[in-house]
Structures are given as C-alpha cells and as structure tokens.
Amino acid sequence: QFDKGCIWAMQSWSLREDIVKAVPRENLLILDLAGKRVRRDQGFWGYPTVIGNLHNFGGRINMHGDLHLLAANQYQDIKKVYPNVCGDGLFMEAVEQNPVYYDLAFEMFHRTDKVNIHTWLQQYAQRRYGARTVNTDQAMRLLLEGPYRRNTNGTERSSIVAARPALNVKKSGPNAGLGIPYDPLILFKAERLLLADAELLKHSKPYRFDVVDVMRQIMTNIGQPIHKKAAEAFEAKDKTAFALHSGRFLQMLEDMDELLRTRPEYSFDRWLTEARSWGETKAEKDLMEQDATTLLTVWGAQEGNDPGIFDYAWREWSGLINGFYKVRWQKFYSMLQKHLDEGTGYSEEGLKLSHGRESFRANDFYISLGDWELDYTRQVNKARTPITQGDEIEIAKRLFRKYEKLSAAYYQTKVSNADIIKTEKTYENLGE
C-alpha cells in the first residue's frame, strides 16, 4: 500500500533526467543541497526544487562561508531564471560553528532584496556584542576579507590538528584538503582588534566565543607550517630542528586544548557526558559513549572491516585534541625520532590512498595506529571534569602573544593556496 498523493523528496547529488521524468511533477520535490546543480541541469526540467547551502559537513570546526553569496540573495536570482524553484534552505550536517554565517543565512530567508554586507556586518557586531566600536567594525571587515571571503562556501578546509599524522599531510577528513584560501596573517590582525576591546565587551558571551574561535583558527592555521618544518627537518636528518618544530607542534595542541576548554561549545567532555546521560544502565551508558566517540573518530566500521571514511566528523574540540589527536601525533613523531636515532628512513611514497589520504592501514605505522584508534573508541569514562575551565579572554590574550611572535618564523612568505584549491577533488559526494 502507498499514498498516491505522497511527495518524494530527492537529493540532487546523483539525479538523472530519465529518473526524474519517470515521476509525476506533483509527486516530486528536488532538494539541491548546495544550490549548484539547478543551473547545470536545466533547472531540473521544471520540477519543484528547493535550493540551499550545505555549509558544514560532519560538524567540523573551521571558519569559512561565502557571506557575499548569501548577501546577494541567490534564491531570488535563481527564481527569476527558474520559476519552479519554490524554496530556499540550509542543509548543514551540524551547527554550533560559524554563527555569523547562519545569522545572515536565516535573515535572507525573509528578504527579497540584496544586502550591503559591510553595513550588515557592522550591525551584526553591535547586536552580537551589545556595543559597536571602531575595532569591531575593522575586525569584521578583516574576517570578510579572510575566512568569509568569496568562494569559501561548501566543504570546509581540513585541519592539521585533526589530520591523521603523515610527513606530507594531505587532509583530515575525506573531503577538502589543507589549503588556506586567504592570508592567515589576516586573523592575527582581526584578533588583535577584538582583544583591544576586551574591557568593554568582556560581559558579552558571544564576544568571548568569537575571541576563542578566531584564536583557535589562528593556531590550527599556523600548525601547518610548524609541522612542515618538522617534516623537512626529519628528511634532512636534522635532529635538533626536528625536536624544536615537533615539540612546538605538540605544545600547540596542548595550548589549543586549554583554550577550547573555556567554552562548552568546543567540549568533547560535554559531548560524552550528554551521550552517557541517554543510557539507563551502565552497559547502556558505556555503549552511548562508545558510539559518540566512534562518530567523531573512525566514523564507523563493521566487525572485521576497517573504517573507510575515518575522521569524517573531525572536531577541533577540547578533550578530543588532548586525548586523541595529540596522542596520534605523539606516536608519529616518536616513530620518526626512532628512525632518526637508528639512522633509518621512512617514506610514504606509493602508499595506498583512501579519498586522497593514506588509507586506514597503509603501512606498519598505520596498522598499529588503527588498532589504537579502534581501541580508543571502546574506552569509557573519558570525560574530564569540570567540563569548562579557565577564562576565555585571559587565555586568548596569552596565546595570542605567543603565536604572534611565532608567526614571524613560520609565515616568512605570503601563503597562497588558490591554485591548489581550485583543482583538488573534494569528494562532496562520497559515493563518487
């Protein structure tokens, strides 16, 4: 039995014209999750369509999002060309990241006009912080020039923090790579301006969130050249330089964990505590924690099979950094140090890849690491108490001074990844 009046909702990832036209128009609603295919596929041949933005995959933490695109009101523009477009939506896989993006996106649902993004950002900062200052205005302009610039929609860039360790780290999750699509020094300028108003804005919780978020992004960005220096030192057999740069990288992970522990939004400990609360018995609580851990680490694996899209839902979260990501990097650097001490080499050339990065058990190191990762998902009672600890502004100021000094050593030339980003395969549809 079936309802003859039902409406099928179909995602547009792999639609084919023959499949679509086999269904009466009144019984089909197409969801163009990223708003890209409607133009390519002739407006889906007149079928009712909802366009939108798929801004986040897996709950990953990365500052990004094309605010210019949102402000241009893409729904109204597309509807003029394809009248069958009947709605606009957001199809993110998780929230609690990039609040400025969602604030504007939800506002645009209620508007038929375009928005002056510069004016809107000034008003947004005033609403968010409870005051408007020259510093916050300038900081917002810099963020628009940086992570929220044009062509930053869709798949977020990878995290060196959450990436499985390698000499040549290609990506963290199975999607986009590590390229930073803006000058990372922009964030230092923005954070300096935000921190300058700390005394005035310290009572604003959103201000405290933003100060932490920008500092987090500064640290994950600079982590890339720090690790690159460590890898270069290993290949040059320079033990002193290797110890310096690998030590700085591991310390950066500890610093980031301390910073993010100030906010519940960035807490793996909160995630695990809430997961356990769903269980009634100890066995149920343990299972909930194991499932919640698996989701953010190996993603999932059937008995006897290795994970295929491990680290799909990576998060730069306190607790997860300290207990999982840092341990992976410690194991990797210890392995490299052993090779240096013994005068032997280590190469990743020719290793089997999975979605553009080394597969789960690509060599002896990854076999051992994979065993540890799977064992980690089975551990219980990992949550630390208290869940939050420390003052956001105090810690952000201290870390800003530290990493601003380090930036001179690691950003000696202007960083540009534009060409790499344009040509890389991001696997937005993991069935590809």
Where would I find each of the regions flagged by the language model?
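Long, low-complexity, intrinsically disordered segments
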Residues: K422-E432
